[in-house]
Every structure is written in structure tokens, then in C-alpha cells.
Design a protein with these regions (language model features):
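Short N-terminal mixed-charge amphipathic segments
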Residues: 1-51
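Generic secondary-structure microfeatures
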Residues: 14-16, 56, 60
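Charged interaction scaffolds used for protein-protein
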Residues: 1-4, 30-34, 38-39, 63-134
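Short, hydrophobic/amphipathic alpha-helical patches that form generic packing surfaces
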Residues: 47-58, 99-103
Length: 134
């Protein structure tokens, strides 16, 4: 996925290390299971900068790299993301950004094959249960 931030084009790619060490999957799952609209909006606003930062690690760690276990270093990079998003959101939509980032994570990362296999298993299980109850 390509994204232009402050006039510079970046490639977003969710690599294994950055995704796992920052516990992105749990945070995305929490977003998708929010109880109400206000809670979902709050979680989306909190997740956007971190999701963007993690997606930038694969190809742009020279500019946005950080040690996920060093809170001060991560917070410094998060501050950059907040500033970038302030500018980005003047002309773009937060919901679309989050949807595109999550789609990139699901469709074009190391997870995509695993997710497709899991969906296939689920469909087979449902089909078997449906057939068994007839």
C-alpha cells in the first residue's frame, strides 16, 4: 500500500517482527469488537498512529524506526505519527485510513495466507455442521 504523508510517498507493509512485538493483532481485534460507536471511534483514534507506525517499519525504519520495548523511543515516534496524522486528516478520512491499513494487514502481510487458511477451515466446519443437521 502506498500512502502520501506530508508530500512524501511511503510504502506500508506489515512485517512479522513489528506486528508481533507491538501486539497489533489484538488491538485490531479489540477495535472490531467494540460495544458501541463511541468506544469504536475512541479505539480507532488510538490505533491509527500505532498501526501507521508499525506499517512503516518494513521499508522506512531509517526514518521511523524504534525499539518496541523502549517506551520513550516508541513514544517519540508516536508523537511523529500524531503530527503526521494531524496534517493528513485535514484532507483525508480517518475511517478510510484505518480500513485501508487493516486491509493491508489482512491481505498483503505475512498474515494473509494464515487468515485465508483459517477462513477456509471455518467455512468447511460450518458446511459440515450444516450438512450434519439436515
Amino acid at each position: 500500500m502506498k500512502i502520501t504523508l506530508n508530500g512524501t510517498e511511503y510504502t506500508i507493509k506489515f512485517g512479522y517482527e513489528a506486528t508481533v512485538k507491538n501486539k497489533i493483532l489484538k488491538k485490531v481485534a479489540d477495535l472490531e469488537t467494540s460495544a458501541d460507536d463511541l468506544e469504536a471511534l475512541d479505539k480507532m483514534l488510538m490505533l491509527a498512529p500505532e498501526l501507521l507506525l508499525v506499517g512503516l517499519q518494513k521499508f522506512h525504519s531509517d526514518t521511523f524506526g524504534f525499539d518496541p520495548y523502549n517506551e520513550a523511543e516508541k513514544e517519540q515516534r508516536m508523537e511523529q505519527m500524531y503530527a503526521i496524522l494531524d496534517d493528513y486528516l485535514e484532507e483525508n478520512d480517518m475511517t478510510s485510513l484505518i480500513q485501508n491499513l487493516i486491509k493491508e494487514l489482512e491481505d498483503n502481510s505475512f498474515l494473509s495466507r494464515m487468515l485465508r487458511q483459517e477462513q477456509s477451515k471455518t467455512k468447511k466446519t460450518v458446511a459440515m455442521k450444516t450438512t450434519a443437521t439436515k
